[in-house]
Amino acid sequence: MPKGRKPKGPVEKKVIHPYSRKAAYLARDAIKQERKEKLKGEKAQRLNLVGEKLLWFQNQLNPDKPEYTRQDACEITERYLQRFDGELEQIELANSIKGRQGRQHSSREAIIKQTIERERAQYEGNGFEIPDIINAKHLKIFREWNGDLKKLPCIKMRKLSAKGSDSKPSTVSQDTHMEEENEEDKSLDSDSDL
């Protein structure tokens, strides 16, 4: 008995019914892949921002200085927070030229101002994350870093705050705290008199 011929061309895919279980499975799989790609892109963008920040800090380091104090780290951080000042001046200069209609570069200006505001709030609040340049061992590792984003986990970070920049608490804050306690005691005494 002769055997039937096998098709030599590509096999046609069966058409999937749109309401079938297989169609639902493929749709879920596609959504899952899109979500993975989106998260991957967001993570890459975050890593790029951190990498740019670390490269900026690395360029600001003095190669002759073996160790940095907390005050030095605060000064470098202040310079980092003022890194857009020149660009903002250029935008203001372009906008001040007479005869121009509208504000040029307004979206870039808004992004810069939001970034500065957010970073300043972090620095004055809970703390702004910088590479740990105060510790000599971590500083050495940071100086040897070549900008590779895959080696970011090797670099230790430290939160630095403007209010925590002094090593000892100021006496002014203690005096104001004592005055507040005295005012509370006086208000409690006046309430009890009623």
Swiss-Prot record:
It is found in: Nucleus. Disulfide bonds: none annotated. One of its GO terms (biological process) is ribosomal large subunit biogenesis. GO terms for molecular function: preribosome binding. InterPro entries: Tma16, Tma16_sf. Pfam families: Tma16. Involved in the biogenesis of the 60S ribosomal subunit in the nucleus. This is Translation machinery-associated protein 16. It comes from Danio rerio. The lineage of its organism: Eukaryota, Metazoa, Chordata, Craniata, Vertebrata. The gene is tma16.
